[in-house]
Amino acid sequence: MKLGGLAALVASLITAGQAPRSTIVFVSTRHDTTLTAADAVRLFSAAEIYLMNGDGTQARRLTENATYDGFPALSPDGRRIIFDSNRSRTDAEPFNTSDLFVMDAEGAHQTALVRGSSATWSPDGKMIAFHASASGHGQPISNNPGAATTDSDIWIMDVDNYLAHRTGPHNITRNPAAVDDDPDWSPDGKTIAFTSHLVTDVSDNHLTAEIYVVNADGTGTPMRLTSNAEEERSPNWSPDGARILFACRRGAPVAGGPFPSFELCVINADGSHLTRLTNNAVAELTPTWSPDGLQIVFHRRIAGPGSFQLFVINSDGSGERQLTFPPGINGFAHWWWTNAR
């Protein structure tokens, strides 16, 4: 019997006498070596979903089409991947319009869900949280830091109920003056962290987005965790639920390009003890914890044609190592244990 996908990967490791290792799902353009970050339109079209070992080896492509696929996240049981795609976008719609899709971890059965972006799974793997326009299934906000956008809410949805009965999502944030995006579900399932800023706050390519948490059922008032004159992005809960990792904008835009300088920061779940983990004056974005909470993977802008690559650091900011290399741009990683299934 031929094994596919993650099952084959686990089998190969066991055969080699090794314990199963961690797996990273990520976005890459390595299949098109002619791309650079300056070619924004083609870059947005060419990005595909890949899977690799946690050490950066054995990368393989899961999606293959002439459109953009991005922001992947593995389900807690490792069997499914939720991701963005603009394959359903019409010519009349903005180029960054995206829908949510779900597929098997091996890349099979790619199925459209609803319009939205940047989904995260609930700990039990039944629900997803994502952001979309306040009208429900309208234009999602841009995922480029500093880009102008319309209002956006955080929505939740039962994936299997939607597939079986078309039971739609409902929004748990409802502020028409704000853009709420980048949700991440807490390990205990009770709260969702997200980023929020005012719709009008798009001047000088410099948002003052902050990190908030809200009850996962939408009750109560969202609680603000950060309060800075800078931009905070992409919150990610630590596996024990004690801390939240995020990208924190510090300083002027990076010389030679439109990407602002983002570092990595961490804060306690109650908003106390904000700590800066990196200080590199470059764009470091979309950080996520390893499943054991000991390491962090993120993508960084580097010089040359492979303008974004994945890096790993220890949870205290030490021990940096580069995980991916040109050709191709690599980023938007999500880490998961292969032997969790």
Language-model-derived ranges and their functions:
Residues 16-341:
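Sequence signature of WD/YWTD-type beta-propeller architectures
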Residues 3-21:
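Bacterial Sec-dependent signal peptides at the C-terminal "C-region" and cleavage site
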